[in-house]
């Protein structure tokens, strides 16, 4: 897939239809974007905006993906462990009853680290 980091402001074919980016470059950019998010995310508990827990979950998922599928090495396991430890000291936790995660009266419970507000009447 082409990875575009700057806006395209012309009708030039090379800009409108860029070549495929190398897979390694795309994965590196994902890692850089996650590290940027870590630096800029503010602490808080509002689950409708990105929180440190949400970013650390993404960081752990990325690191485990790189380790398992891209031969990323032990550095990626350490990165995942670091992110999971950061989540472990937060208020996020697994609930004892799986069904309670989805209960209408239990929205945004302790297991939810990021949520979207689905307001069906909003236009």
Place the predicted regions along the sequence by residue:
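Structured, solvent-exposed acidic/aromatic patches
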Residues: 1-123
């Amino acid at each position: 897939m082409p990875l575009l980091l700057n806006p395209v402001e012309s009708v030039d074919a090379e800009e409108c239809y860029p070549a495929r980016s190398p897979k390694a470059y795309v994965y590196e950019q994902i890692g850089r974007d996650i590290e940027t998010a870590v630096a800029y995310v503010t602490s808080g508990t509002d689950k409708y905006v990105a929180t440190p827990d949400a970013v650390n979950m993404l960081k752990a998922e990325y690191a485990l993906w790189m380790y398992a599928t891209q031969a990323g090495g032990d550095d990626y396991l350490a990165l995942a462990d670091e992110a999971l430890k950061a989540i472990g000291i937060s208020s996020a936790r697994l609930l004892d009853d799986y069904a309670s995660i989805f209960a209408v009266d239990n929205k945004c419970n302790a297991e939810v680290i990021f949520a979207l507000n689905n307001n069906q009447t909003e236009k």
